[in-house]
Amino acid sequence: LPGLPAVINFGTGDAKQGFETLKKLRPDGPFMTGEYWAGWFDHWGEHHHTTAVAANAAEYEWMLQQGYSVSMYMFHGGTSFGFMSGANSNGTNYEPDTTSYNYDAPLNESGQPTPKFTAFRDAIARVTGKTPEALPQPIPAQTYPIAARAESASLWNNLPAPVESDKLLTMEDIDQAYGYILYRTRVANGAAGELVIDGLHDYAQVYMDRKLIGTIDRRLGQSRLALPPILNKATLDILVENSGRVNFTNVIRTERKGITGS
C-alpha cells in the first residue's frame, strides 16, 4: 500500500539478497527486516535445529553497518504451553511444532545467554563503539527429585456424555478447539480388514474393546491401519489428537480437527 513501510523476512545467508529485493520495492526506504531468523523452530520427529553462530553474527553485524533496522526473531526462546504449539504445512505435508520453542535463540528457553548472545553482543559493540554492560548472574537451576505417581484415572472411566451423530463430526462441529476427540462405533463380526481414515487431523490411537490396535499419524502421511478378525461384535474407538493448527497460508481454511473426511 502506498505510504506504508514494508519489511522483509529472512534467515542466515539471505540478508544481502533480501535487502536488494526490498530496495526494488521501496527504493526510498525505510530498510528493515521484520523477522531476522536467529535460529529455527522444531517439528516433532526432527533433530533440534541450530544455525552457525559465526555466520549469524557476521550477517547481523553487516546489517547494522549498513544502517538497516533489524527485528530479531527469536531473541528469547520460549515454550508453547498446552495445545498451542502450531504447525507448518505446504498443503500436502503436515509438520506439528514441538512444545519447546527454544529456537536456538540468543537467550535460550530458560532465559540463559548462549554463545550466540555473546557473538551478537560483540557485534553491536564493534558497530557502536560502546562497551556492553556486565551481564547479570546466571539464573540458578535446581534439580528436583523424582516424583512417584500416586494415583491415576482411566480415560474410559471419565468420558463426558457422548454426542450421537449419523455422520462424522469434527472438533469444531461440537464447539471444541483443542485437545482430543473420541469416535466410537460398534463393529460387526468379520474377517481381518483395514481401517482407512480420510482427512485425519492429526494423530489417532485406535482401540478395539479398549485394547490398543495401533496408531495413524498425519505427520507421516498415514491413513490406513490393519484390523484383526472380529469374532464377536466389538467396540471400535478412535482417539484423535489435535497436534497443532497450521496458522498461515490458505491451508488455514482446511484446518478443522478430528476426522475431517470419511
Language model: regions and residue ranges:
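Carbohydrate-binding surfaces of carbohydrate-active enzymes
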Residues: 34-39, 63-68, 75-262
